């Protein structure tokens, strides 16, 4: 018996026949799948779709990890720096001194500070009421009176702030 599937290749249609040659020898398959109707094909797809979907979903984090270990460590280091230098004014992405200058995407875009480079520049040199934290920040009145941050630390902060803004400021553990 031979099943004819419209648009199916000879290989595909051979999968669903009751007799098939194996390695050039006329050998009968012990448990052939016989499809007589489109209903049988629909039934087969309905039975196979849920387990195949589950397998694909289970394997997808392995094949496509959301971020690398290095990015995770940088985010944690950025969170630690943020908690040390920025959280006094910008707790959970807000701004207790100037409410329209939060670290949420909408305000960052409106204020022209929506890229890592711009966040770095504002963190280094300051802007408006925000003091600069860079080692070479000038003029003196625009810069923090507290400890200055190294370039790499400001880069980590800029990456962290951009990442958090893109995520809507979820809680990040610094452990």
UniProtKB/Swiss-Prot annotation:
Post-translational modification: Binds 1 heme c group covalently per subunit.
Protein keywords: Chloroplast, Electron transport, Heme, Iron, Metal-binding, Photosynthesis, Plastid, Thylakoid, Transit peptide, Transport
Main location: plastid
GO molecular function: electron transfer activity; heme binding; iron ion binding
InterPro entries: Cyt_c-like_dom, Cyt_c-like_dom_sf, Cyt_C6
Keyword presence, Transmembrane helix: no
Keyword field contains Chloroplast: yes
Residues holding heme: 98-102
SUPFAM superfamilies: Cytochrome c (SSF46626)
Annotated GO CC locations: chloroplast thylakoid lumen
Binding residues for heme c: 86, 89-90, 130
UniProt-annotated location(s): Plastid, Chloroplast thylakoid lumen
Highest taxon of source: Eukaryota
GO BP terms, alphabetized: photosynthesis
Family per record: Belongs to the cytochrome c family. PetJ subfamily.
Oligomeric and partner information: Monomer. Interacts in vitro with LTO1.
Misc. comment: Cyt c6 and plastocyanin are functionally equivalent.
Record's function text: Functions as an electron carrier between membrane-bound cytochrome b6-f and photosystem I in oxygenic photosynthesis.
Protein name stated in the entry: Cytochrome c6, chloroplastic
Source species taxonomy: Eukaryota, Viridiplantae, Streptophyta, Embryophyta, Tracheophyta
Gene: PETJ
